[in-house]
Every structure is written in structure tokens, then in C-alpha cells.
Amino acid sequence: MKYADAGVNIAVADEVKQRIRHHANRTFTSGVLGGIGGFGALFALDNKKWKEPVLVSSADGVGTKLKIAMAMGVHSTVGGDLVNHCVNDILVQGASPLFFLDYLAMGKLDPAVIEQLVEGMSRSCRKAGCALIGGETAEMPGFYPPGEYDLAGFIVGVVERKKILTGKAVKPGDALFALPSSGLHTNGYSLARKLVFEVAKLKPDTYVAAVGNKIGAELLKPHFCYAPALKNIVARGWVSALAHITGGGIPGNLPRVLPAGVKAQIDLASWPVPPIFKFLATLGKIETNELLQSFNMGIGMILVVPPAFVKSVEADLKRRREKFFRIGRIERGDAGKPRVAHSGSLNL
């Protein structure tokens, strides 16, 4: 008996390595030592560029958005989403990405699908200036249903110790700015899929007039990467904190960067809610608090800006033609009370 008889095909694994090597090589920066295929990936930090470098790491996935990609046969988007999500996570602490690794597992290796996924990762890595230096592609027969896979990403970035964003500098009077999301990004898909495919019984290629798009394409919209838009703002020290709005929505993520004694006061009417969220809210008859905890509701990143830098941040974002909204402010908060309060109503 051979390994292939148990469902593991070494020849196909070798083909996969050859197909993805080119996409990884295109991301390599000056810090990369060696290439794809070693037992470990090597990266040399430029000591001349950094005085007191601190490495920042993060790991994440794209959740059940993968189910949408599998149903539509479009995989490069979620590959890119994985990188963008991780880049945004370390950006919150002021870090610039250095390198990225991925973990991909499926029951039977499909070289075409894997190449799509890695091509998407490669594209997002190049845009972020991040090297895709390695990963693991696992063939696990009997573990995943045919055509399904799981995907995770791991990123390492760097920030000067003195420039780490900890949130400790957040004070009452700071302004809250928000950058829009493209849609669900990579969170809330379990609820969205239940509403769309079980409650409404739609197909991925069903056109939804209220959304202005085929529902599958709408749900597969890419997760924005905010690093290019915020690079200068972060470098100049114009923010006291950043919050990436992912699982848990605004109430679940903004408090993670707020020190004790303060709260965020948000005006829910201060930004336009994308049609997809209005559609989902109507389908599920979802109340405001549940919406805010389940979805990003059109907000992908929140900036906490001291009063002295408000005009500078506004001017920088306008110069880059970035959409943004001023959604609230930081106020004094009491222990034991919610860290995020809101007024007004969502534009549903």
C-alpha cells in the first residue's frame, strides 16, 4: 500500500509548491533570506532603520466567509482578506508589517484552488509591503468534506517602542473618526448566511435589488486594508488609539483600546449604513444592539484623535481622498458602566 492509497498525494503536493512559489517570490522584500520550501523562513530586521524595534504578531482567519467563496468558486478574495485582516490588527498598535505565513488545510489538495488563495494573499501582501515567506498546506483525507478547506494567517510586524499605540493616552475630549468598511469584511457571516440562505432561501447568484448586487458577490466584497490610508497619520503620532472593528462590532472592539475612566460616546446617525446591513436587519428583524454586536455596520476602523490633531487628520485623509466620518468623542466614564454609549439611530 502507498501513501496515495490513504488519500495523501505527494506528487500533487509538489505541484502545489511549484504553482505558489512564483506568487510568494513576488512579495519578497530586502529582509527575506532564502526562499519558499525550507524548514523555517528567515527574515533579517534592518538594524539601521530601527532604534528600539518591538515585534508585533497576530493570527486570524476569515470565518465562515469561506463558505461563500467555496459556493461561488472564487477563492482569491478570501486569500487577500486574510492578509488585510492581519495587517489591520497590528496597525492598531502602530506596527508596519514585515512578513506573513499561512495555514491551509483540505481533504484533498486542489492545486487550482490553492493557487487562487495564494495569489490573493500575494496581491494583498505586495500592497501592504509584507513578505509572504512561508506556510503550511495540509492534505487531511477524511477530515474535510470534498471542496472545503480552512484557512488561517499569521503576521509579524515592527514598531518603535516609543511609538507603540497602547490607548493609555486616550483622554476625554478626543474625537472619534471612522473609516468605512466595504461590507461585512470577515465577521458576522454565520448570522448573515443563516438569514440569506436559510431564512430567505436565496442562491449566491440571486440579484437583490435592495443591495444592488448579486448576494454572493456582495458578501464576498474584500476586507479593506487601512495601512496605506493611515501610514502617515500613525507615523506622525496624530492618533492616541486605533480600533479595528471586527468580531463583536464597535461595542466589542473599541473598549479594547480605551483606558479606565473613559467611555466612547457615539452618534449612530453620523455615518451611512451600507445597504447589505439594512437588508440583513430587515430579514432578521434584528434590534440595534444586536446589529452593533454582530456586524461592523459600515465602520472598519476607528481613530481616536486628540483635539490638537483633528485638523491635521482631516486634511491628511482628504488629501488622500479617503472617506471618513466623525462619529463621536471620548468622555469621562464610570466603573461598571458600558464603555461605549450611543445616541441617535442607525440610518436603516
Q: Which functions belong to the PLM regions below?
A:
Residues 66-68, 188-190, 325:
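A short, polar/proline- and glycine-enriched secondary-structure boundary/capping micro-motif
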Residues 1-30:
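N-terminal amphipathic/basic leader segments beginning at the initiator methionine
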Residues 2-7, 22, 113-131, 144-151, ...:
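Glycine-/charge-enriched secondary-structure boundary and capping motifs
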Residues 172-213, 217:
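Acidic, glycine-rich loop-and-beta core segments that form the ion-binding/anion-interacting portion
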Residues 22-182:
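Glycine-rich phosphate/pyrophosphate-binding loop regions near the starts of catalytic domains
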